[in-house]
Amino acid sequence: MKLNNLEFFFVNSPIRAYIQERYELPLLMNMLTSKAFDSVLEIGCGNGNGTKLIKKYFNPIHITAIDLDEKMIQIAKRTVQDETTAFKVMDSSTLDFPNESFDAIFDFGIIHHIPNWKDCIGELRRVLKNGGKLVLAEFSIDTFSGFPGRLYRSMLSHPYEQMFSTEEFVQYLERVGFKIDDFKKSNPLKIMPHFLLVASVPSKAHEKTDTAGTENHTADFQHSDFR
């Protein structure tokens, strides 16, 4: 789903860049036990600011950054001019990559834009290696409830009827085989509450020793953590 004019302005604004680098990245880095990734995928890369931060703070050997909007990809290519980074126009719910292609996948607020978000999560699980990390900052229908959430609804073009709640999102991650490593709620500048999450695909060795697997891991978090 492409951005309307207001959203396009916001994601390309200094405010968005400031929030990403000063709030989201430090929190996500603290949530990761390891920051060494060889091959990274960023979905919904937009103008490339998130890609630039991944390069700066994680320095993977190679980054593949995708976006559905060709206009955003052209902007991103100007933002990050590096031979170790490849930008592609691609739908995050139908990824054109082989199974187990990436050590880490980053998402800075794109999945809530996708009506068929479960397909997207399934694809992320497919292309992430065993032992790989899903690192994300996301919004949910909870963001757009109450005030000022309902005001945002009148201004932002999102698939609200299909949008997940925070709890539903976490439970679906576990259903398809992710293990939740860490979860935090965030609301920098007190303007738009969202959540930060790190999940992993258990390695084969871990799967053999932990037969309880992902089904019961949600119990480690209180339901209030997701609201």
Labelled PLM ranges:
Residues D182-G213, F221, F226-R227:
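Core SAM-dependent methyltransferase catalytic element
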Residues M1-S34, N49, L53, M72:
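Conserved class I S-adenosyl-L-methionine
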Residues G109-H113:
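Short catalytic micro-motifs in class I SAM-dependent methyltransferases
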Residues L41, N47-T94:
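Class I SAM-dependent methyltransferase SAM/SAH-binding core
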Residues K71, P115-D119:
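Short N-terminal helix/helix-N-cap motif within the alpha/beta-hydrolase-1
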